[in-house]
Amino acid sequence: MDPWPWLTAALLLLLLLVQLSRTARFYAKVGLYCVLCLSFSAAASIVCLLRHGGRTVDNMSIISWFVRSFKYVYGLRFEVSGQKKLEVDGPCVIISNHQSILDMMGLMEILPKRCVQIAKRELMFTGPVGLIMYLGGVYFINRQQARTAMSVMADLGDLMVKENLKVWIYPEGTRNDNGDLLPFKKGAFYLAIQAQVPIIPVVYSSFSSFYNVKTKLFTSGTIKVQVLDAVPTNGLTDADVTKLVDTCYQSMRATFLQISQIPQENSAIKEPGVLPAQ
């Protein structure tokens, strides 16, 4: 029996569902995003291996080029303020808020040279995506084993100074779409103090106007990005971590609410919180 009529009918039915159902459109776009991530990761891995032969932070420029094309597929626009503040000569720790699977597009849109990320170890085993992250120099941390995670962070602190690396970290530790920032974990701040390098906060506006898992919304939209002034850590010690976390949290939260046009009294979290290093 010829399968093509059935396949054609199934495709037409899927297209009809996408047109008529907001939920179907949402899952279709998320599914396409996953397919893009897998296929582009495979293609980028080949390019990285041919160009640089293995794992190196220099592969990040190739990865960034591939990922920046995603915004055209989804009709997303980025309005960036203060990007030149990321163009520092020396090493630094970059921190930003973490909202959804779309954060990767925002990160790659403004990724500075010689910048690596920290990610949970489970992502290393996600096929082509894990491979391209490894080739790009991403540092994987096993968050279930605190001692191992702290050891990796300590090694990274020495390496970032030695090799002049910028390290991008999401201090909330997990994706969050509640209309506010979650309390920050301390790991990024211990790292900056250990290496005596500045912290550069980056804030992305809320995605809720065009992407919302709960309401199955996924349309085109504009993302505002604001790079804040660097926060120095020269002379600070571990005893100053809590104050440093609070300083960064307060400035990032105020900026997030402002560029997202969310009144502070309507935000989900009223008081900043600090979580243990992880």
UniProtKB/Swiss-Prot annotation:
Tissue occurrence: Expressed at high levels in the liver, at intermediate levels in the kidney, gut, heart and skeletal muscles. Undetectable in brain and spleen.
Q: Which residues lie on this side of the membrane: Cytoplasmic?
A: 51-121
Its UniProt entry gives the catalysed reaction(s) as: a 1-acyl-sn-glycero-3-phosphate + an acyl-CoA = a 1,2-diacyl-sn-glycero-3-phosphate + CoA; 1-(9Z-octadecenoyl)-sn-glycero-3-phosphate + (9Z)-octadecenoyl-CoA = 1,2-di-(9Z-octadecenoyl)-sn-glycero-3-phosphate + CoA; 1-(9Z-octadecenoyl)-sn-glycero-3-phosphate + hexadecanoyl-CoA = 1-(9Z)-octadecenoyl-2-hexadecanoyl-sn-glycero-3-phosphate + CoA; heptadecanoyl-CoA + 1-(9Z-octadecenoyl)-sn-glycero-3-phosphate = 1-(9Z)-octadecenoyl-2-heptadecanoyl-sn-glycero-3-phosphate + CoA
| Signal peptide positions (record) | 1-23
InterPro entries linked to this entry: AGP_acyltrans (IPR004552), Plipid/glycerol_acylTrfase (IPR002123)
User: Which residue intervals are topologically Lumenal?
Assistant: 24-29, 143-278
Query: What job does this protein perform?
Result: Converts 1-acyl-sn-glycerol-3-phosphate (lysophosphatidic acid or LPA) into 1,2-diacyl-sn-glycerol-3-phosphate (phosphatidic acid or PA) by incorporating an acyl moiety at the sn-2 position of the glycerol backbone.
Family, according to the entry, reads as follows: Belongs to the 1-acyl-sn-glycerol-3-phosphate acyltransferase family.
Which comment does the entry carry about domains? The HXXXXD motif is essential for acyltransferase activity and may constitute the binding site for the phosphate moiety of the glycerol-3-phosphate.
The name of this protein is 1-acyl-sn-glycerol-3-phosphate acyltransferase beta
Give the organism, scientific name.
Answer: Mus musculus
What's the encoding gene here? Agpat2
